[in-house]
């Protein structure tokens, strides 16, 4: 269970059982184990190495090309290192596969991870490599003098992001990318319904406008767009939605020690409210309906909450839109922070 202050928003590269590290991968049921890894005095360029890297790419061909080009450039600098890339479309699948492979000692050398996943990996014996000594090594660490590329120094890494890669006083990952959530809005639809997009969205406003947008005419078509499809409000991550709502209500979700607090009266009230809007057709989620951007861009959605990392998919002029140009509708896009209770 993720503590809500993590909010699944930051990603990092974790070094899981690096090449040359001892790899006794039996589960320890709650104990925090460290891999027996020591920084070598020098890098042996005569020895061949293979590194397995598990990454996420959202089925984005441009992102895939960046991964491949980066690996190609890296292998040109280090011809004795081969990087084997495996791409996933879901962070949870990487997490599950790492856990599954701990028992068979087939974890990747490097993987993209949420910081809170590392705590689970550490329950295995000698699975995750602590990076403190490697990061500080003057030759091969951050900004190291013997590196074949221009590496950032530790001082050049945003300290707040680096801190999220620390657990029990040790660094187990390096920051890789960062995003948050935003609400992408069809401003034309909001105004067509007689409303004005406020600077700060509230849940009451979202629900009221969404219910208005869900109304159908006598011909059983949606009044707002004259079509057969309209999902006024779509939230990409229901995990994040619940975390946001409970945090805003100062209600329990979980503690840093893993204590579950989500089963409370506030959660019950929130879920009943959401269920009402699902029944009326005013609300849906990615897992039920698909990507919010596809509906927003086609004029079939008013409010779409998604990651800022996906901004290039949102709106009629989105360069990475997954729908055809013929299906896109022209409208003014407004962007706001996620809805608030106050």
Say what each PLM segment does.
Residues 4-10, 21-127, 144-147, 151:
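Conserved N-terminal structural module of periplasmic/extracytoplasmic solute-binding proteins
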Residues 38-39, 43, 116-180, 327-339:
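Hinge/lid segment of periplasmic solute-binding proteins
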Residues 47-49, 76, 82-84, 104, ...:
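Extracytoplasmic/periplasmic substrate-recognition and gating elements
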Residues 87-97, 203-207, 285-297:
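Short helix-initiation/N-cap motifs at beta->coil->alpha
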Residues 109-112, 302-306:
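Paired acidic/hydrophobic, glycine-rich loop segments that form the ligand-binding mouth/hinge
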Residues 132-156, 199, 224, 249-269, ...:
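Short, solvent-exposed loop/beta-turn-alpha elements that line the ligand-binding surface or hinge
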Residues 163-176, 181, 205-260, 303:
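Extracytoplasmic/periplasmic solute-binding protein
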Residues 209-211, 256-287, 338:
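Glycine-centered hinge/linker elements that transmit conformational signals in sensory
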